[in-house]
């Protein structure tokens, strides 16, 4: 099965999205999610043109890994932090097909 990547855009006010991401890192919740079976990437970014948004790139080996993550103890903690910081989200979901023809354009 192909890798699944979910981009989550957390939007807040007065620095709340960044404070959320910092608490996720400092509390160890982000590391616990990274340690879950099937997690391939869990990384926060701040768009240069929008300091009130934080982008989470969250990649998983397959849908079963995402389903297991959704019932993990970390999801309850994560949901509580989202509420604490009053965040709103936009989500994009991608399934990688590893298109071979693109590799000639990629410098690794």
Feature-to-residue mapping (PLM):
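Short, well-ordered beta-strand segments in beta-rich or mixed alpha/beta enzyme
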Residues: 4-11, 41-71
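Short N-terminal helix-initiation segments at or just after the protein's N-terminus
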Residues: 1-5, 35-38, 56, 88-92
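N-terminal/domain-start segments enriched in small and hydrophobic, helix-friendly residues
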Residues: 3, 9, 13, 25-26, ...
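Alpha-helical elements of the RecA-like P-loop NTPase motor core of helicases
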Residues: 18, 64-67, 76
